[in-house]
Amino acid sequence: MMDTTFFEALSDYEKSLSDDRLAQFKIQAAKDVLQRLAVHKLPKKQLPKLSFTEKQILKNPSLMPLDDLLSNFRQWLITQFGVWYLPNLKWLADLNHFIAGRRVLEIMAGNGLITYGLRALGNELVTATDAFQWQEQDIEIADPWTQIIPLDAEIALQNISYDVVIMSWAPDTAQTDVKILNYLRATHFTGDFILIGEPFKHTNSMAFWQTAQLTKVPELNANHHSFDTIDDRIFLVK
């Protein structure tokens, strides 16, 4: 059952800021995501930028507490739903088109929202794996949206067939991501390694960013834009 604390706070601001159209737009977008995630549905499109500019707050100081609340939206998604990366249906359609019928392996899939979305589009060649070792994370109990094989990423790479590898929001507290990249290089992987993360900041290890050769793909970023201060993007990695 969804903890409604955040949702109720948004509803309160929806009432108190009823005359501010921009606030209403952001509040309704955030509420829609919470309602959808609670019943295992993905947002139809990318969230708008949830923060307000300094100019907007100076014009209407009543926005400041709402801005503070919305700055914690991603953390709420993590602690309540186990969602670090939030895919949307438009982006998933782009991803599915890019994959073009190839075999997909999603590693460190978490609750499997990306795989769930691809399978909902009829993609039957996608496999999701996660070791589910979430101790000391902000959420420690998994709530998979789809079938996920409980496998360590390195073992999955060695035992499952794939043409495309997807890794999103790998933790910055371990160097598993470097081991994965080194394995793909050592085995001369010629497919696509799709990465979702923020270079040198909130995702992945520093060692990974220092060695990864990144290419930003316009097609995979067209319907993905950060909704907060974390500038995660979609890359191909070599």
What are these regions (language model features)?
Residues 101-110:
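Conserved class I S-adenosyl-L-methionine
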